Structure formats: C-alpha cells, structure tokens
C-alpha cells in the first residue's frame, strides 16, 4: 500500500499540493565533488582519479533551516493535471528537502504534486509506456541512454535554464557519455552503494567481521552468523547484481549470461540469511537495531546514522565502501516527452540548480549534488564526510554503471524474481 503525505502552505491563495510517498531509496545527502566514469565495460582508474581530483574548495557552512510541514494521510489524486499552475514531479523517496517544495510554490505560485518510486525499473516502465502525467523525473545514468533513444524524454531548453552555468563541468562531461551534448538531462545528485552496519551489534556477533569487504554479506559462512541480528538488501536488481559481480571479481557491468548465473548462485547461497529486501525500510530498521547489516545507498545509511543518533538508544551506524569495489551512480533531472507542463518543469529544474537551493537539498538528503556553485554553501560536516566524498584511497574502488541492454534487463528481472522468492 502506498502512503500519502500532503504538504500544504498558504502563500496568498497558493498551496503546495500533494507529496505522495511510495518508499524511500537513497536517502538524503549532501554535496558535490568527485566523480568517475567508465566507457564501454572497462574503467580507467587514471581517468577516475583525474575526475575525482577536480573539486577543491572553499569553506563556509550552509546550515539551511528546514520549514516545519505537517503531514496528513489521505487518498492520492491527480486532480491538478489540467491546470497550468502545477508541476508533477516523480522522484526517489526522501530525495529532496520538503521545505524547498514549499519555497518553490511561494516564489512561483506553481503547485508541486510529488510522487515517489523505489527503483529505476519502476520509473522506466512508466516512461516507456508513455502518458505518465509527470513533468520532471529523475533517472540514473545507467538507464538514461535508452530512455533518450526510445524518445521517452524531451530536449531541455537551455534558454529557460539560466542556472545551467552553476553546473559542475566534470559531471557534465560524465553525463555527455550518456546524453551527447547534455541535451536531455542535468545532474541532480550522485552517490555510492555500500555496507551499512550497526557497529556494536556486528562486533558482538563477530569481533573481526570484515566490514570493509562484500564477504561480510556474500560469504555464506559469515552471513549465517548475522541471520539473527538481521541482514537487509536494497530492492534494486541492477545495483545488487553489480555488487555481486564485484564481489566475484567479475566485470560488474558484464551482461554475460554466465556471469549473471554466477551472481545468481552467490545471491541464492545467502538468501536464507536475508531478513529484508526493501529499498526503504532498511533505513529505519538499521537505525533502530532491527537489522545489523545492510547493502544500501550511502545517503540512506547516513540517514539511518542520523536517526539512530537522534533516538539516543546507543545504536552507532557506520558506512563502508568495500575493497572489492562498488557502484558509483549519477541521478539526473529530465522531462518526459509528453510532459503536460514543460514550462513549469523547466522552472522547477532551474530552481533546484540555484546554489543555495542545491546546498540546502544536499544538507538534507546526504548526497553530493552536481552544482559546483553550491559547494561552498554546503555544511562542513557534509563536505568533509568520507561517506559522501570518498578519500583518495577509496576513489579507485568506484565504478560507474553503464547502460543495460533490454535483453539483459529481462534476464536480470527473471533472476531477481527467483532470488526474492528464494527459488
């Protein structure tokens, strides 16, 4: 069942509209900085190092205060579709500072109807079917190429995006490999997948647990030890198969049926020890001690860390980038081909690229953003957090995902179904 939250505020006679929540994904994050890229299916460590070394920077704290918003559960509706003063946004859950939606409405009079999804696969299914009713979507680069090729997205009008000048040039170069000429998308946030763990619970079970390795989860002999305190995986087929192949020493972007079969074998071997496969619930479960180990996105694990600290129950949550390597992802803002309100979509995207807005967003969501001009405004704690900006020794471990062929996606979905069901 999906949960509905409605954020409203009065600014004259304007209201924000609805924020419909399915389930979170990569939760919250902060800044903008190092990135890497991989063409074809090999990664150049030197190229990654060059890209990661580009952002150095400035100081300043940008403590952005949030606006208190009341939440109310009620049935969702797309009642605003025919109106001109509305923008329909489809984004990952907990992937925006809610106060910014209110601010956008206050400044423009445009209501925000905000729906959420839990995986790229869900978004792509809707985009490929067409007539989504959405004006702004947030695909990852691994899916962007084929959405452009299929005609699911429309070109951006740069004349309506004056804040384009604030964008990080290195990230634009990365996106250019997926979107030649940067015609269809603008980076929103970027981050990594890794291991989130409850420090005390893990130590109690296994004092010498390999928290810096995917062995912690993929070695059945080790995973079995943590069955009782709980292991969670994000419900993200592409990301988990990428990670499984990294653990096995294979090309994580391989589309070989043989490699996928090896990944499936590794996953099925640990399936009896997995308590939760969910792109959202693992965050609170990690924060409250319901689980002790998770494969999650860095922002989600950091959000669990913050929630645990706020609760004051003694749970200390850590994030690790495994030594075998992991996924580096980039999420971008784009406009569906048949968006009902493209002018409002451009206004919303341009708003998000204002430096102070991008900084406030990163401070809340705990992910790095693609706005170079915002860097000095991001909180120091975010800018210096190695879970957000990995240090030099970790940068070579990050591998960007590439585009999946439709054939591989079908194979992967069948594999994932078997894994989730345990068959």
Question: Predicted segment positions?
Answer:
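C-terminal motif of bacterial Sec signal peptides marking the signal peptidase cleavage site
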Residues: 56-58
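A ligand-binding cleft/hinge motif common to bilobed small-molecule-binding domains
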Residues: 143-146, 293-314
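Conserved C-terminal helix/tail region of periplasmic/extracytoplasmic solute-binding proteins
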Residues: 284, 392-423
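A bilobed periplasmic-binding-protein/Venus flytrap-type ligand-binding module shared by bacterial periplasmic
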Residues: 33, 196-201, 246-249, 329-341, ...
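Mature extracytoplasmic/periplasmic domains
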Residues: 336-397
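Periplasmic-binding protein-like
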Residues: 260-269, 275, 313-337, 383
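Extracytoplasmic ligand-binding site segments that recognize negatively charged/polar headgroups
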Residues: 91, 96, 122, 133, ...
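Early extracytoplasmic/lumenal segment of secretory-pathway proteins
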Residues: 60-63, 67-147
